[in-house]
């Protein structure tokens, strides 16, 4: 059966300093500009597969057992941003999956990110809060099958991981007026990456971003004439 794989998320979660993701990483000292290479020529096409990631994670299972994994099984497997990049580097020799990808640039990016805790936090691959929304034709307890070989963009997975690792923490926008107005953005739900049968039943919900504006009381407000 044909397999579909796609990602969906908010435009506010781009790799740039002015966006929400840039403000999230700035809180831990990570320069989001270093990750913009994931959107540029040479790395933008970098992809990994769930099966390739599972091999990098060193799961003690054979090829036959891999084919029997279910969405429920993936909910019990955790991966970090470093693991995701390692999977892309490991897949560098696959001319079909990563043709033309600058592996040296990925190695440099990994070296930079390794020093940051947020890039080493491990999150579930599957489940309601997982990096992947994996849909099996027979349900969550049925084998994923060919879905494990579906190619997913590395940049999409890294973006999802960084947002999910931040949880639902608010990020100040710096657009307010002291004592009058404060504006904060909160990621209610991170972007999702979906894998499943190409039968119209494979779906993913977009990232939800909530804007909160607090208006304080101030009796005397004057503006320069």
Where are these regions (language model features)?
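Primarily marks folded extracellular/lumenal domains of secretory and cell-surface proteins
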Residues: 65-174
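Charged, amphipathic alpha-helical linkers/stalks
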Residues: 3-92
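Proline-rich intrinsically disordered, low-complexity coils
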Residues: 2, 50, 60, 71, ...
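Short, conserved structural patches
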Residues: 1-25, 149, 157-159, 163-225
